[in-house]
Regions:
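Conserved ABC ATPase "signature" region
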Residues: 115-133
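Conserved ABC transporter NBD signature motif
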Residues: 63-74, 79
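Conserved beta-strand-loop-alpha-helix hinge in the C-terminal portion
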Residues: 213-237
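Conserved ABC ATPase signature
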Residues: 137-141, 145
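The feature captures the beta-strand-to-loop junction immediately N-terminal to the Walker
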Residues: 40-42
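Catalytic Walker B motif of ABC-type/P-loop ATPase nucleotide-binding domains
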Residues: 162-166
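Helix-to-loop junction immediately C-terminal to a conserved catalytic motif
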Residues: 55
Length: 275
């Protein structure tokens, strides 16, 4: 399994009219080693920024991010061969007219024989129940079908790590269950953000992100309870991170998180080989 490490990584951006940069992600030191990791939080909390650090789509303003010792800035090609990324909006990464062509494009670098490439593409599409739709225009597919196609195209090249940004957002109940079963059967390390708290409960470890900071890191049940408490208190994405850092709140239960200010109140288109 891949070892992903953030060492004092932070993301800041300049904003016109503001004397100081806007902080998208507070400085964070953490190791991501579990098989299935989730990131939960309100819209705008910093979930996507954190995920995009993991394969070099976002460059840290300070600190470093490494995947198996490969730096995401200096060795971005090596990182992207290992880390597959699925966006919330599948049209951000589906670039061919049909699903068949898109999956075959993903395989082009690793599978040189056209017949074998076609066979593997069909096998991948069938795995997701998409083979009957393989030759339809991607614009004729539903949002959920496009999302499954984007996932299929990334998995076709067998990345070591699969990063998914809110993968169930566009899926109906049937396809959400298909997604959950598919993820459960994968050998890859999975790191995903989600608003689907039932999906979060399937994971090994969950981080709660609020206002650009990780405010909880631990088991899924405790993390979901923590996030629900933030939402009930009206704190999520509105300064809860500052509240969570005040003295007297218990520390995160996860020993991988190394942030002395992180405490909790006791209560988750680039393809591998393409650049």
């Amino acid at each position: 399994m891949s070892a992903i490490a953030l060492d004092r990584a932070a993301v800041r951006v300049a904003v016109d009219g503001r004397p100081a940069p806007k902080i998208l992600l507070e400085e964070l030191t953490v190791r991501l080693t579990e098989q299935r990791i989730g990131i939960i939080g309100a819209n705008g909390s910093g979930k996507s920024t954190l995920l995009r650090l993991l394969n070099g789509l976002v460059v840290p303003s300070s600190g470093t991010v490494t995947v198996d010792q490969w730096d995401t800035v200096r060795s971005v090609r090596e990182v992207r061969r290992r880390v597959g990324f699925v966006f919330t909006d599948p049209l951000s990464q589906l670039v061919m007219p049909t699903g068949r062509e898109d999956v075959e494009l993903s395989l082009r670098r690793s599978v040189k024989n056209a017949r074998e490439r076609s066979r593997q593409a069909e096998e991948t599409l069938d795995r997701f129940g998409l083979l009957p739709l393989a030759d339809q225009s991607i614009y004729e597919l539903s949002g959920g079908e496009r999302q499954l196609l984007a996932l299929a195209a990334v998995l076709a090249v067998d990345p070591e790590v699969l990063v998914l940004d809110e993968p169930s957002t566009l899926l109906d109940l049937r396809n959400r269950e298909l997604l959950r079963r598919t993820l459960a059967g994968l050998s890859q390390q999975i790191i995903l953000s989600t608003h689907d708290l039932e999906l979060a409960l399937d994971l090994d470890r969950v981080l709660v992100v609020d206002a650009g900071a990780v405010v909880f890191d631990g088991g899924p049940a405790a993390a979901v309870a923590h996030y629900r408490a933030l939402c009930a208190a009206g704190l999520a994405a509105s300064g809860a991170a500052a509240d969570a850092a005040r003295p007297g709140w218990p520390h995160s239960e996860n020993p991988h998180l190394e942030n002395p200010g992180l405490e909790n109140p006791g209560l988750a288109p680039q393809r591998p080989g393409q650049l």
